[in-house]
Amino acid sequence: MSLFHLIAPSGYCIKQHAALRGIQRLTDAGHQVNNVEVIARRCERFAGTETERLEDLNSLARLTTPNTIVLAVRGGYGASRLLADIDWQALVARQQHDPLLICGHSDFTAIQCGLLAHGNVITFSGPMLVANFGADELNAFTEHHFWLALRNETFTIEWQGEGPTCRAEGTLWGGNLAMLISLIGTPWMPKIENGILVLEDINEHPFRVERMLLQLYHAGILPRQKAIILGSFSGSTPNDYDAGYNLESVYAFLRSRLSIPLITGLDFGHEQRTVTLPLGAHAILNNTREGTQLTISGHPVLKM
């Protein structure tokens, strides 16, 4: 089975019972889980001091255990504080041989983007310990797609997407929309041309989602891509003031401005049902009336 190494670079794990349930669920399945002490750390709202959380990341360059899945405990906030002090060069060098399979989402997007920007390091945007493996019930779709991505050098995700008939090919990248916005103009924002940009978020009103997408558009980032895929935007319910304005309104307005395809409907993000995407891998997107396919390759996988 597999070895999981936990890291907690972001928010304090307030749901300790869920973290313990996630560890138990993984061990019951025959996996080994290391570095479990990080789940109890706390300094203010963070999962430990800056020094402790930074060491979670920098120590990965010295991690010698082979075939290891590095799993973020949770998101929240905290990764942005660490970006200037992460030893990116050492992490990039480490990933060039026997790469760790690094997985997380939400606030962790900042670290994933930094690794991609500094050395084209591929990481996995997917489930985390508390929210997913530690849920009351582990979602079967999420579990299947996690192992699908980590065990197969080439795999395909299928869904019924909304958008124009299209075919696009390029580097798959993105993650949490708010975190990408926070990186614009910094050394940790990947400079990817002709890519396939995939985005998701949580607890953002539709007008805030639109404002962030327009910031990417006005910054020239969206027009430089081959395609955009939008995942879930949990907790984005409009109110009476919106008078019919909703996420579909956002998508329609963006499509009126973009000359590239925008495809929606992917189960990707903060919901219990989510795919796992290797950010930085090669992807081919096909969208037709019959459905949508995203074929991904070129990412590190577990050695079976």
Swiss-Prot record:
Q: Where is the active site?
A: 106, 200, 270
Q: Does the keyword Cytoplasm apply?
A: yes
An annotated GO BP? peptidoglycan turnover
Please give the pathway this protein is involved in.
Cell wall biogenesis; peptidoglycan recycling
- Which reaction is recorded as catalysed by this protein? N-acetyl-D-glucosaminyl-N-acetylmuramoyl-L-alanyl-meso-2,6-diaminoheptanedioyl-D-alanine + H2O = N-acetyl-D-glucosaminyl-N-acetylmuramoyl-L-alanyl-meso-2,6-diaminoheptanedioate + D-alanine
Cellular component annotations (GO), alphabetically ordered: cytosol
Give the location in the cell: Cytoplasm
Output the superkingdom of the source species: Bacteria
Per UniProt, activity regulation is: Inhibited by beta-lactams containing a D-amino acid side chain.
Gene inactivation effect:
Bacteriolysis during the stationary growth phase. Cells lacking this gene also accumulate UDP-MurNAc-tetrapeptide, an unusual compound that normally is not present at significant levels in E.coli cells.
Matches recorded under InterPro entries: Carboxypeptidase_A_C_sf, Class_I_gatase-like, LdcA_N, Peptidase_S66_N, Peptidase_S66C, S66_fam
User: Does Hydrolase show up as a keyword for this record?
Assistant: yes
Q: What is its main location?
A: cytoplasm
**Molecular functions per Gene Ontology:** carboxypeptidase activity; muramoyltetrapeptide carboxypeptidase activity; peptidoglycan cross-bridge peptide endopeptidase activity; protein homodimerization activity; serine-type peptidase activity
EC code(s) of this entry: 3.4.17.13
Q: Pfam families from the xrefs?
A: Peptidase_S66 (PF02016), Peptidase_S66C (PF17676)
User: Keywords assigned by UniProt?
Assistant: Carboxypeptidase, Cell shape, Cell wall biogenesis/degradation, Cytoplasm, Hydrolase, Peptidoglycan synthesis, Protease, Serine protease
Q: Which family does it belong to?
A: Belongs to the peptidase S66 family.
Q: What does this protein do?
A: Releases the terminal D-alanine residue from the cytoplasmic tetrapeptide recycling product L-Ala-gamma-D-Glu-meso-Dap-D-Ala. To a lesser extent, can also cleave D-Ala from murein derivatives containing the tetrapeptide, i.e. MurNAc-tetrapeptide, UDP-MurNAc-tetrapeptide, GlcNAc-MurNAc-tetrapeptide, and GlcNAc-anhMurNAc-tetrapeptide. Does not act on murein sacculi or cross-linked muropeptides. The tripeptides produced by the LcdA reaction can then be reused as peptidoglycan building blocks; LcdA is thereby involved in murein recycling. Is also essential for viability during stationary phase.
> Protein name, please?
Murein tetrapeptide carboxypeptidase
Which gene produces this protein? ldcA
